[in-house]
Regions:
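Signature of the catalytic double-stranded beta-helix
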Residues: 1-41, 45, 52-53, 58-63
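Hydrophobic/aromatic-lined pockets within catalytic cores
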Residues: 23-27, 72, 130
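A structural signal for short, well-ordered beta-strand segments and their strand-loop junctions
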Residues: 30-37, 66-70, 79-82, 126-127
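Residues that flank catalytic or metal-binding motifs in active/ligand-binding sites
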Residues: 34, 63, 76, 143-147
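Short, solvent-exposed loop/turn segments at secondary-structure junctions
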Residues: 38-45, 57, 73-74, 87-88, ...
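Catalytic core of non-heme Fe(II) oxygenases with the double-stranded beta-helix
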Residues: 48-118
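Conserved double-stranded beta-helix
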Residues: 88-188
Length: 188
């Protein structure tokens, strides 16, 4: 993945995959994660599991979305699951009561409500990383290969991951560039 991330135009090409949907969903002045993540989930491999979580639970900004690009057909346990918004709201309202529960206990409590995403090769998924999501052991006979990267509005609040450290602007308008580099004249 390091050599892939070293490709000069990788970030721009990745952005272009989702640009038609990102702009109406997130805005037209966007910050993009500096490094694109690669996920490999082999059949029956329990070493690459991502337990149920929402990225916001660990300090990410609720203003972010994830662009998930499968490099194979993803379905059932070869994919990921997502808790729909209404079920996520119910979970949030009872979250304090579940404090101390394991992620497995939490998954068992919501398992009947999660949606296993079917995303064919060649399609892109954009999802709200504030919704609980994760994966389970891949019980399908094929390996899942996917990439993911976060995007957010440049001028929306940041969580623990800051601009310049984790994010970098990928689209800025002329007025924003001028404003960001503007220096007030000195007055004595």
């Amino acid at each position: 993945i390091n050599s892939i991330n070293a490709e000069v135009d990788l970030r721009l090409r990745y952005f272009e995959l989702a640009k038609p949907w990102l702009e109406p969903l997130v805005g037209n002045e966007l910050a993009m994660q500096l490094r694109i993540n690669l996920s490999i989930q082999m059949p029956r491999d329990d070493s690459s599991l991502l337990p149920v979580h929402a990225d916001t639970w660990s300090g990410d900004s609720p203003y972010e979305v994830v662009v998930w690009v499968p490099m194979v057909d993803c379905f059932k346990t070869k994919s990921m699951y997502l808790l729909p918004p209404e079920a996520a709201r119910r979970l949030r309202s009872e979250f304090a009561r579940r404090a101390g529960s394991s992620s497995e206990d939490l998954f068992q409590a919501i398992e009947s409500e999660v949606v296993w995403l079917e995303v064919p090769y060649g399609q892109v998924l954009i999802f709200d990383q504030g919704l609980p999501h994760g994966n389970r052991v891949n019980e399908e006979p094929e390996t899942r290969w996917s990439m993911n990267c976060r995007f957010k509005g440049v001028f929306t609040p940041y969580g623990d991951k800051k601009i310049g450290e984790f994010f970098e602007p990928i689209t800025l308008r002329a007025a924003s560039r001028n404003g960001m580099s503007y220096q007030y004249p000195e007055v004595s």
